C-alpha cells in the first residue's frame, strides 16, 4: 500500500493522459471530478498541453525557415528535434531530407529578384555538395536521386532538362506539404501516452527476453548432454586406469620377490589400457613379449589430434565498409567495429586468422596508409562512448598480432592518438584498458618503444601506479609490464633517474601488492633501473635494502631468489666495461612469431542487436559481401615443444596473454627454417654464420621457420649484462651448446657476474609484453632476454590477476644450457 501511495499521483496522471488521448471526454470529466472530491493529486504528464504547444512552435519555426530559405536555422532545428534514429533509420525521412537540401540549394535561383548573390549561391551549392559526399552518399545507388548528384556541377541548372521539374511552380508547395505531414506524424508519435508506451515496451521486451532465454536453454541442454557423455567416459577410463595401476604396483612388488611376469599377463594389462575399438584386434595381432612393444603401442594409442579443415571466411566489400565506418550512424559504426573484431578474435588460429588479418591490412581497413582528414582511425576520438570503446578494442586486437603491429606502426599518428586517448579517457574504463593493452604490445617494436619514452609515458605510468588499488587488474598488470619494458632501455633508465625517488617508492610499494602477477615485472624494472649509479645511490639513501629484506622473509623461493639478486645489484659498484654502452639503436626490430588473442578483447559487450537487427558475421556477409579474393598466406610458425623451466630467468619483456598460456610471446623475431628443424629434434647447435645473418634481418626463407629466438643474438665475449640490460649468448638450435667462458667477478661483493646474470637476463633487442616471465637462469657467459617459442597456436587468455603465479614453474627445453 505504501508503494501505491508513493506513486499514486503519477499513476493517476497516466490514466488521465490515456483517457485524454483516446478521447474519453465524459469518462475523463468524471475521473477528474472524483479525484478532486477524494483529494487525490493529479500529476501533470509529459504528454500535456505544454508538450503540444512546444511541438507546434517547433513545427512553425521549421516551416518558416523553409519558406525563407534559411538553410542553417532549418537544419539546426531539424537535427535538434528530429531524433537520429528517425533521420538515419526511416527511408521516408532520408528521402525528404535529400529533397530539402535540394530546395535550399536552388532557393536563390528560384526566388531571387534579379541575379542571385554569387557568394551566397556558391555557399549554398557547396553546402549541398558536402551533404552529397557525406550523409547523402547513402542514396547514391537509388535511381530516383542519381541525377541530382550532378546538380552542384551544372553551370545553369534552371535550363538543364534533368532539373526541369525542380523549377516548376508546383514543386516547392508539394515538398512543403510533405514536410508538414511528416512533422505532424512525428509529433503524433511523440504524443503517444506513456501508459501505452509502457505496455508495448514491456510486452515486446518480455517476448525478446523469453526467446533469448529459450535459445540459451536449448543450447545449454545440448552442451550438458555432450559433457555428461564425456564425463562418463573419462570416469570409466579413470577407474580402469586406477585398477591397472594397482595391478602393476602389485606386479612390481612381486618381481622384487623374484616372481616373473608372464607374457599373457602383460598382454592382458596392455589390452585393458587401449580403447575399446582396438582391444579385440590387438589381443591376437600384437606380440607384447617383444621388448618395447607394449610401451610403443601405448604411446601410439594416443592418436594425434587431426587438424580440422577450416574454410576461409568470405571476402568483404571493404570500400563500402570503410565508407559506412566514416559516414554511418554511431550504432552502425559500433556494430561494424564489433563484427570486424569478432572476425579476427573468433577466427581459427592459423590460415583462417592470417587470411582475415591480411585482408584487413591489404585493404587498409584502419586507413593507416591514408592521409585523408576523415579516416577510420578518427573513430578513436568519436563523441560516442560506444564507438570510441569498440575502436580501441579493434586496435588492441590488431596489436595482439605481429603483422597487425607492423601495420599499425606504419602510421606515426596511431601511437600519438593512443597516447592522447590514454591520458584523456576518464569515462570508460574498458576503452582505457584496451588503449593501454595496445600500447603495451606496441612496446614489442623498438622504434615505438623509443617514441613512448620520448613522449614521457614513463612519467604518466609512474603517476598512475602511485595508487594501484584504484586500478583494475588488467590496467595494473599492463601498466607495470609496460613500465618494465620501457625501463629496459638506456633512455628509459635515464628518464627514471630524473624522478628516481618517486619511481623507487612506487616500485617498492608494488612489491607488496596482493596481485602476484605483477611481481616479475616489478622485480625486472627494479633490477634494470638499479644499474644506473644515481638511482642506486637514491635507493640506498631511502633504505631500499631493508625494504627488500622484509619481502625475503615473506616471499616464496622464487621471489626470494629474485630479490637477492636485486640486493646484489643495489650493492654493486660500477659495472664492467661494455655494460654501459647504449642499447638504443633501432637496427633490430623483427617480428615475433606468436600471437595472443586475449579473452578480454570480447568481454562486457555494450551493444546487443534488437529483434531483426543484424550483427557480427551475419551483418558482414549480408550487407558487405565482396568478390571472393581470399587467398591463404603462409606464415612462419614457432618452435615446437620449447617451454620455459622454473629454473630459467625472465629473459625478455613478454605479453600478459602469452604468459598465462604456457608459452612466451616475445620480441619481434624471425627464424630460418633450418634452425627450426634441428630445434624440433631437440638438438641445439651452433648457428651458422649465414643463417645468423638472415635471422638478424628477420627474413625467413620458408613458411615453416621456427626456432627458439634465443639463438638470435650473440653476446660479446666477456660482456656481462644484467637481465634487462643485455643479450643472452643464446644457444642456437643447430649444434652443440656453447661452452661459456668463466664470467668476470663483481668486485663489490665477490659474486660472479655470471651468477647475477643468471637471475636477471633482460635486455631485449626488442622488448615484448609481459606474459611469460621467469627468473631462474641457465648458466652462461652473458645472459640475455631471449624469446622462446612454442608451435601451439594462440589461446584465450584469462583476465590478469585471475591466475596468480601461473607464470611459474613452466617446464623448459633450455634447462640443459650450460
Swiss-Prot record:
PROSITE patterns, per the entry: LISH
Polar residues biased stretches: 792-818
Source organism, top-level taxon: Eukaryota
Primary location group: cytoplasm
Entry-annotated residues carrying Phosphoserine: 582
Impact reported for residue 343 to C: In JBTS30; uncertain significance
Any GO CC annotation of this UniProt entry: extracellular exosome
BP term (GO), one: positive regulation of smoothened signaling pathway
Keyword Coiled coil found: yes
Annotated consequence of substituting residue 446 to C: In JBTS30; uncertain significance
Keywords of the record: Cell projection, Ciliopathy, Cilium biogenesis/degradation, Coiled coil, Cytoplasm, Cytoskeleton, Joubert syndrome, Phosphoprotein
Region (Disordered): 642-755, 790-818
Places the protein is found: Cytoplasm, Cytoskeleton, Cilium basal body; Cell projection, Cilium; Cytoplasm, Cytoskeleton, Microtubule organizing center, Centrosome, Centriole
InterPro entries linked to this entry: ARM-like, ARM-type_fold, ARMC9, ARMC9_ARM_dom, ARMC9_CTLH-like_dom, ARMC9_LisH, LisH
Coiled-coil regions, chain positions: 204-230
Disease: Joubert syndrome 30: A form of Joubert syndrome, a disorder presenting with cerebellar ataxia, oculomotor apraxia, hypotonia, neonatal breathing abnormalities and psychomotor delay. Neuroradiologically, it is characterized by cerebellar vermian hypoplasia/aplasia, thickened and reoriented superior cerebellar peduncles, and an abnormally large interpeduncular fossa, giving the appearance of a molar tooth on transaxial slices (molar tooth sign). Additional variable features include retinal dystrophy, renal disease, liver fibrosis, and polydactyly. JBTS30 inheritance is autosomal recessive.
Function comment: Involved in ciliogenesis. It is required for appropriate acetylation and polyglutamylation of ciliary microtubules, and regulation of cilium length. Acts as a positive regulator of hedgehog (Hh)signaling. May participate in the trafficking and/or retention of GLI2 and GLI3 proteins at the ciliary tip.
PANTHER family attached to this UniProt entry: LISH DOMAIN-CONTAINING PROTEIN ARMC9 (PTHR14881:SF4)
Subunit structure, interactors included: Interacts with TOGARAM1, CCDC66, CEP104, CSPP1 and CEP290. Interacts with NDUFAF2.
Protein name: LisH domain-containing protein ARMC9
Amino acid at each position: 500500500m505504501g508503494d501505491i501511495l508513493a506513486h499514486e499521483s503519477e499513476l493517476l496522471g497516466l490514466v488521465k493522459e490515456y483517457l485524454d488521448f483516446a478521447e474519453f471526454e465524459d469518462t475523463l470529466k468524471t475521473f477528474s471530478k472524483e479525484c478532486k472530491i477524494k483529494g487525490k493529486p493529479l500529476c501533470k504528464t509529459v504528454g500535456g498541453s505544454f508538450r503540444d504547444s512546444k511541438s507546434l512552435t517547433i513545427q512553425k519555426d521549421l516551416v518558416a525557415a523553409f519558406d525563407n530559405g534559411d538553410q542553417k536555422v532549418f537544419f539546426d532545428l531539424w537535427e535538434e528535434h528530429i531524433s537520429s534514429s528517425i533521420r538515419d533509420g526511416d527511408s521516408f525521412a532520408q528521402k525528404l531530407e535529400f529533397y530539402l537540401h535540394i530546395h535550399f540549394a536552388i532557393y536563390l535561383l528560384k526566388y531571387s529578384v534579379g541575379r542571385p548573390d554569387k557568394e551566397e549561391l556558391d555557399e549554398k551549392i557547396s553546402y549541398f555538395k558536402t551533404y552529397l559526399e557525406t550523409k547523402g552518399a547513402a542514396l547514391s545507388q537509388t535511381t530516383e536521386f542519381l541525377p541530382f548528384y550532378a546538380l552542384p556541377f551544372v553551370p545553369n541548372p534552371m535550363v538543364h532538362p534533368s532539373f526541369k521539374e525542380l523549377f516548376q511552380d508546383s514543386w516547392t508547395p508539394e515538398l512543403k506539404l510533405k514536410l508538414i505531414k511528416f512533422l505532424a506524424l512525428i509529433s503524433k508519435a511523440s504524443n503517444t501516452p506513456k501508459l501505452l508506451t509502457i505496455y508495448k515496451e514491456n510486452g515486446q521486451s518480455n517476448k525478446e527476453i523469453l526467446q533469448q532465454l529459450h535459445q540459451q536453454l536449448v543450447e545449454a541442454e545440448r552442451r550438458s548432454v555432450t559433457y555428461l557423455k564425456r564425463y562418463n567416459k573419462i570416469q570409466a577410463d579413470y577407474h580402469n586406469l586406477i585398477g591397472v595401476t594397482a595391478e602393476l604396483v602389485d606386479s612390481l612388488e612381486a618381481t622384487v620377490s623374484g616372481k616373473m611376469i608372464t607374457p599373457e599377463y602383460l598382454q592382458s594389462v596392455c589390452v585393458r589400457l587401449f580403447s575399446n575399438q582396438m582391444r579385440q584386434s590387438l589381443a591376437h595381432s600384437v606380440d607384447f613379449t617383444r621388448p618395447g612393444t607394449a610401451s610403443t603401442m601405448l604411446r601410439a594409442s594416443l592418436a594425434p589430434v587431426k587438424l580440422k579443415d577450416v574454410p576461409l571466411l568470405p571476402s568483404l566489400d571493404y570500400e563500402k565498409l570503410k565508407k559506412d565506418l566514416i559516414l554511418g550512424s554511431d550504432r552502425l559504426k559500433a556494430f561494424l567495429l564489433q563484427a570486424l573484431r569478432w572476425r579476427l578474435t573468433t577466427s581459427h588460429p592459423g590460415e583462417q586468422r592470417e587470411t582475415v588479418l591480411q585482408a584487413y591490412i591489404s585493404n587498409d581497413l584502419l586507413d593507416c596508409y591514408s592521409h585523408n582528414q576523415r579516416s577510420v582511425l578518427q573513430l578513436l576520438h568519436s563523441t560516442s562512448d560506444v564507438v570510441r570503446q569498440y575502436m580501441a578494442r579493434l586496435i588492441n586486437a590488431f596489436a595482439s598480432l605481429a603483422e597487425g603491429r607492423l601495420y599499425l606502426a606504419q602510421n606515426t599518428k596511431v601511437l600519438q592518438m593512443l597516447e592522447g586517448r590514454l591520458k584523456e579517457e576518464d569515462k570508460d574504463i574498458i576503452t582505457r584498458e584496451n588503449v593501454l593493452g595496445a600500447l603495451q604490445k606496441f612496446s614489442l617494436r623498438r622504434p615505438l618503444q623509443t617514441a613512448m619514452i620520448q613522449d614521457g609515458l614513463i612519467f604518466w605510468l609512474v603517476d598512475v601506479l602511485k595508487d594501484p588499488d584504484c586500478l583494475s587488474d588488467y590496467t595494473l598488470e599492463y601498466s607495470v609490464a609496460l613500465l618494465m619494458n620501457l625501463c629496459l632501455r638506456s633512455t628509459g633508465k635515464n628518464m627514471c633517474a630524473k624522478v628516481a625517488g618517486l619511481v623507487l617508492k612506487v616500485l617498492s610499494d608494488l612489491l607488496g601488492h596482493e596481485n602476484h602477477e605483477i611481481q616479475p615485472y616489478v622485480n625486472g624494472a627494479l633490477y634494470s633501473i638499479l644499474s644506473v649509479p644515481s638511482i642506486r645511490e637514491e635507493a640506498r639513501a631511502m633504505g631500499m635494502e631493508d625494504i627488500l629484506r622484509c619481502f625475503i622473509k615473506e616471499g616464496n623461493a622464487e621471489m626470494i631468489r629474485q630479490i637477492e639478486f636485486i640486493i646484489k645489484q643495489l650493492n654493486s659498484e660500477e659495472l664492467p666495461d661494455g655494460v654501459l654502452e647504449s642499447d638504443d639503436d633501432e637496427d633490430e626490430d623483427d617480428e615475433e612469431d606468436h600471437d595472443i588473442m586475449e579473452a578480454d578483447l570480447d568481454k562486457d559487450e555494450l551493444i546487443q542487436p534488437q529483434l531483426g537487427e543484424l550483427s557480427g558475421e551475419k551483418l558482414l556477409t549480408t550487407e558487405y559481401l565482396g568478390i571472393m579474393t581470399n587467398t591463404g598466406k603462409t606464415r612462419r610458425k614457432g618452435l615446437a615443444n620449447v617451454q620455459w623451466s622454473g629454473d630459467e630467468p625472465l629473459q625478455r619483456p613478454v605479453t600478459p596473454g602469452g604468459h598465462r598460456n604456457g608459452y612466451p610471446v616475445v620480441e619481434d623475431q624471425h627464424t630460418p627454417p633450418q634452425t627450426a628443424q634441428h630445434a624440433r629434434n631437440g638438438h641445439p647447435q651452433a648457428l651458422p654464420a649465414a643463417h645468423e645473418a638472415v635471422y638478424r634481418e628477420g627474413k625467413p626463407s620458408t613458411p615453416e621457420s621456427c626456432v627458439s629466438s634465443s639463438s638470435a643474438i650473440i653476446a660479446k665475449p666477456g660482456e656481462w649484462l644484467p637481465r634487462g640490460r643485455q643479450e643472452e649468448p643464446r644457444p642456437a638450435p643447430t649444434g652443440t651448446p656453447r661452452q661459456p667462458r668463466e664470467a668476470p667477478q663483481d668486485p663489490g661483493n665477490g659474486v660472479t657476474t655470471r651468477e647475477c646474470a643468471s637471475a636477471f637476463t633482460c635486455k631485449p633487442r626488442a622488448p615484448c609484453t609481459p606474459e611469460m616471465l621467469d627468473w631462474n637462469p641457465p648458466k652462461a657467459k652473458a645472459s640475455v632476454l631471449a624469446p622462446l617459442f612454442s608451435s601451439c597456436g594462440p589461446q584465450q587468455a584469462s583476465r590478469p590477476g585471475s591466475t596468480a603465479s601461473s607464470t611459474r614453474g613452466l617446464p623448459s627445453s633450455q634447462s640443459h644450457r650450460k
